Design a protein with these regions (language model features):
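Metal-associated gating/positioning segment near the N- to mid-region
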Residues: 45-115
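Short catalytic-loop micro-motif centered on adjacent basic/acidic residues
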Residues: 91, 121-122
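Glycine-rich, flexible loop/turn motifs
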Residues: 38-39, 70, 116, 122
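Alpha-helix termination/capping residues and helix-transition junctions
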Residues: 2, 15, 83, 114-117
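Histidine-rich, glycine-flanked metal-binding segment
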Residues: 1-4, 9-53
């Protein structure tokens, strides 16, 4: 599905500018002052900021610490991240005492697989 965001303010590492953004599936295909296509859903982005997805490189989902477990697991934490514009998280994978790093990482993958709503890494 193609979506064309019209008249938004694009925010990038080079500053801000008024532009249209054409997205095809999960990829940004074009950013330009004026884009015209016939086969895209049009979204009026006037007065809105168009920014890339953010990366949170320090999360702790479903982590047992100090006799308690963190409030968010991968399902709730990733949905909250997406609502705030974060599209990728990097979680702290901590093996249990006596576990190998490989086994600890496998456990974290099991906690996230099928539950995490955004991209993730460890």
């Amino acid at each position: 599905m193609r979506v064309l965001f019209k008249n938004g303010t694009v925010v990038s590492g080079k500053g801000t500018r008024r532009a249209d953004v054409l997205v095809d599936g999960e990829k940004i295909r074009r950013v330009a002052r004026e884009i015209h296509v016939d086969d895209a859903q049009i979204v009026d982005a006037a007065g809105m900021l168009l920014m890339p997805g953010f990366i949170d490189a320090h999360t702790h989902f479903d982590l047992d610490v100090c006799n308690t477990t963190t409030a968010d697991d991968f399902a709730s934490g990733s949905r909250a991240a997406l609502r705030g514009g974060t599209t990728t998280i990097v979680d702290f994978a901590c093996p249990n005492k006596g576990e190998t790093l490989h086994d600890g990482l496998r456990l974290w993958h099991e906690k996230a697989d099928g539950k995490c709503a955004c991209d993730y890494g460890f």
